[in-house]
Amino acid sequence: MSQDAVEATEELVEERERKSWVIDLRPLKVVAYRRMWVGNGVSFFGFQFTSVAVPVQMFAVTHSSAWVGLLGIAGLIPLLIFGLWGGAAADVVDRRKLLLASSTLAWLATVGLFVQALLGMRSGYLLLGLTALQSAGFAVSSPARQAIIPRLVPARLVPAANTLAYTTTTAGGVLGPLAAGLIFGLASTATGVTVAYLVDAALFTISFWATWKLPPIPPIEPEPGEERPTAGLSGIVNGLRFLVTQPVLLLSFAVDIIAMVFAMPRALFPEVAADRFGGGSAVGWLFSAIAIGSVIGGLTSGWIGRVKRQGVALVIAVVGWGVAIGFSGLVHQLWLMVLLLAVGGAADLVSAVYRQSILQVFAPDRMRGRLQGVFTVVVAGGPRLGDLRAGATADVTGITGSWAGGGFAAAGLAMVLAAAFPALLRYRPPAMAGNDEPIVSKP
């Protein structure tokens, strides 16, 4: 076969892949990205054991959803402090080394959770402290991890790489809580949380391996006249200055904050599982439901990259999330609650892919870490504020008022914001900028 025929065949295959509704797997051909994808997926599966165990243990110790909600604040404060700094550092140092160091901190926090559970400590304050330490490690590692992706794959495959990353982590979000729920259904709470923390600590080592095998990812030298990034306050301020000049980015962050703060019902899952469904494995289903929907949304995501009015699609996805969460708070059948939460999860996957891809299109590599730091604060901080809101309002209005009312409020506020500031509704993606060549992985 001639070279022209080979190239024509490859173009035909790519065209079919672009038109397919099935998830785009082309980024997995890049060895470095594939290793990182595997490592992140396995470690996120393990982290879900901890994400279920900590609120379950907190509720068992305190018998209060308000205390469970405080876990949101314990996770939020380090995110605010270290998320922005970690993003600035990712623009200054080798991102691989930064990811290794920050992941070690998060792993040590998980080991601490295992030790306190093994020793039978019953301290809500200790759980809050270890949650804060784990959040600090995540806050630094997340901007570096996300800023690495455009350095590993060609620019045209960045949206597909983001979709693969979200789908894989949410698949871990399905299997992890289900497995954790099975543990809690078969064992006592004390035994269940101990095993859950141990599983997380063990699986985290796969992520270390994947990060170690990454190639060096040093900062790209700025062009003459461009800013040389710093990890200090001035570097963070310069990143924020760039952000405020991009109204589409600001609005995309704002609708996400609304969606997560008002509609995230996660802090209510332990109480609802115990009171409505008798405890046991129900808590695993509730924690898995949103992720189940996200996986389904990811596996059928081939259409996402073909949408031209991505701002409109983002708003529709956020409204769909709020409405689905609102109705799920009104039902008393476990299967129907799981189904509605899954619909919300599919909508959340769509909005997450658009937000991340919009950000990576706007940001040059020299500012990508800092903007990913802001993204980390918004995306990870929003649900934690949502935990606090849900727990606090549940003690005042009851479970239904906190859960359903928050979901419908999020949908309404997102529509009002989009109508008041139509820049997001008018957004269409520009051509992807930047170097189209991937970094070659270590052998």
Each model region followed by its residue ranges:
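Alpha-helical transmembrane-bundle signature of multi-pass membrane transport and export proteins
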Residues: 1-443
